[in-house]
Swiss-Prot record:
Region spans: Disordered: 1-30, 349-380, 569-610
Disulfide linkage: none
SMART domains hit by this protein: DEXDc (SM00487), HELICc (SM00490)
Positions bound to ATP: 72-79
Key words, A-Z: ATP-binding, Helicase, Hydrolase, Nucleotide-binding, Nucleus, Ribosome biogenesis, RNA-binding, rRNA processing
Designated name of the protein: ATP-dependent RNA helicase dbp9
Main location: nucleus
Matching SUPFAM superfamilies: P-loop containing nucleoside triphosphate hydrolases (SSF52540)
Motif (Q motif) on chain: 28-56
Encoding gene, per UniProt annotation: dbp9
Biological process per Gene Ontology, one example term: maturation of LSU-rRNA from tricistronic rRNA transcript (SSU-rRNA, 5.8S rRNA, LSU-rRNA)
Gene Ontology, cellular component aspect: nucleolus
UniProt domain comment: The Q motif is unique to and characteristic of the DEAD box family of RNA helicases and controls ATP binding and hydrolysis.
Function as written in the Swiss-Prot or TrEMBL entry: ATP-binding RNA helicase involved in the biogenesis of 60S ribosomal subunits and is required for the normal formation of 25S and 5.8S rRNAs.
Amino acid sequence: MKRKLDANDVPSTEANEAEEVKGADRDEDFETLNLDPRLRQALVKEKFSKPTPVQAKAIPLALEGKDILARAKTGSGKTAAYVLPILQTILQKKAIDPSMKATTGLILVPTRELAEQVQKVITTFAAFCGKDVRSVNLTQKVSDAVQKAMLADYPDIVVSTPARVIANLGTSALSLENLTHLVIDEADLVLSYGYEDDINALSKAIPRGVQTFLMSATLTAEVDTLKGLFCRSPVILKLEDKDDHGAGVSQFVVKCAEDEKFLLTYVIFKLQLIKGKVIIFVGDIDRSYRLKLFLEQFGIKSCILNSELPVNSRIHVVEEFNKGVYDIIIAADEQEVLGVSKSRKSKDATEGDDELLSDEDEETSAKAASTRTDKRRKLSSKEKDYGISRGIDFQNVACVLNFDLPTSSKSYTHRIGRTGRGGKTGMALSFVIPADKYGKHKPTSISSAKHDEAVLAKIIKRQAKLGHEVKPYHFDMTQVDAFRYRMSDALRAITRLAIQEARAREIRQELVKSEKLKRHFEENPEELRQLRHDGELRAARIQPHLKHIPEYLMPAKGKKGISNEDVGFVSLRKTGPENRIRKARDRNRGRGKKPGRKIDPLKTFNRGRK
C-alpha cells in the first residue's frame, strides 16, 4: 500500500510528529462550539446538553480543518463528533452558494447495521436544515439502477461500506472530485473485515487535501495502516472515560459442563435471576438456533441476530431491542469465534497505546482458528458486512451472557462493553468449559471451548491490568440439579434436523418481512411496530408441561419472585367473558319456535281404537 502524500509530495509524518491529546475537559458545552443555530436546535430537540469527551475535543479541532485519529469506544458519542463538523462545513458552503451540488462527505463503515445507524444520526442532526443537506446510505438492498439514481442528484454525504463505494466508482455513479471530508468509523475493523483491496483502491481515488477522521475503539496495526494512507499529521485523541474498559461492569465466570450451559441458562431466565435486557453471545449460527429452540420449550421468548438474516430484519431487531420490545437477544458472533478476523500483531508501541494485548493472547486466538484454511479465512460477502460485538449501539443492556467464551481477551472486552455504559452499571457472566469436561456431551459441544481455560487466564490477566476483577460465581447445584431432567427432555427434542428447519423457516419469514412488505411498512409505520421477531419457530417438538414449573421444584427464595401470593377465588365453573359461548346458548335456547297456545297435558292423550 502506498502512503498518502502531502501538498509537497512528501509522505505523511508518523505519530511522533503528530499532536497527541489525552483526557477531556467536561466544562465545555455546545454553545461554545459555535455551531450553526439549526444544528443547535437539533441538539436541543435530542436533549444533548453537554458534549461527551470525544465531542468536546474533536469538534473544535475538526472545525479548524485538522485530521483526527480518535480512540473512543462505541457509545461515547464519536458519531456526532464527526457528523456535526461535516454538517457545519456543508451549511457554511451552502450559505455562500445555495445552488452548490457536490458530494463533499464520505463516511465508511464496516457493516450495514452501522451504516444505518450513522445515517439516522445524520438525519437527526439535519432535521432543521431543510433541503440544504442530503445524505444517502449505499448499503441499502436496492438495485444498481436505483442506487445510480440516488447518486445522480449529488448528495452532500454518502454513507457506505468500502466495497459499495468502489462498485459505484467503477460505474461512474459516484464522483469524489469535490470530496472534502473522509470518515472511517470503527477503523480497526475495516481492514480485518476483508476490505483491504477496496481501501487500497480508494486511497488512489481520494483527492489530495481531504480532511480525514479515523474513529476506532483501539489503536491497532490496521489503524496505523489507514493513518499512513489517508492522514496528514493527524491529532491523536486518546480519551479515557470513567466507565472505559468496563469499569461499571461486574464480571463473573461460571465453570460448568457443556450441557450445564443450557441448564444454567434455563434456570437464570425461568427463575428471573437477571432483571432487564440481556445479550447472549454464542459461537455460531447453529448454536443460536439450538439455544432459541431450547428456550422455546420453556416458554421463554428470544430473538436471533446472525449474518444470514436480511439486513432490514437485523436493524429492526436492534431498534426494537433498544425500545424495550424484546428482553433477550441471542447474537451469533461467528466471525470472532471462528477466527475469520485477521490475526495481526499490534503495533501499539509506535502509538504508545496501552492496549494490553500480549503475544500469548494472539497465539491463543490463532490456535482456535488453526483448523481453518486460508480460503475459509477470507470473509464471504454474507459475513463481510455483519458484526455484532462491535459498532452497534445497544442501549440499557443489563447483562452480557457469554454462553460461548470468545477466543481472545480483546474480543471479551468488546463484548462486555455492550453493558454498563453511560455511567450505568451492568453485569457480564461467562460460561467456561474446563479441559476435563470438554467433549463429554457431543450434541452441545463446540470446538472453541477446547481453549476456554487458556483464554480465561488471559482475560483475568488483562482485566487485572485494567483494575477490574473477574470473580467466580457459584450456583447452588443441589437446587439447580432438580431442573436437570427437564433440561434433558428439552435438549433431546432439539435435533440437527430441527435446527436446519428452524434456520430455513426463519430466513423465509424474515425475507417476507424484509423485502415484500418493505414498501407497505413505509406507508404503514404503525404495523411495523407490531412486527415481532421473537415468535416461536416450532421446529422442535414442544412439550407443554415444560413451560410451567411445579411448586415442588421451586426454591424457597424463588417462589415469591415469580408467583403472586394471593391468587384469589377460583370458581369451579368459568364465569368470565371467556364463557360467552355457553351464555349465548342459554339465551338462544327456545328461540325460533312458533309460540303456541297453552295445552293441558291431561287433555292431550289420544284414546286408542278398539
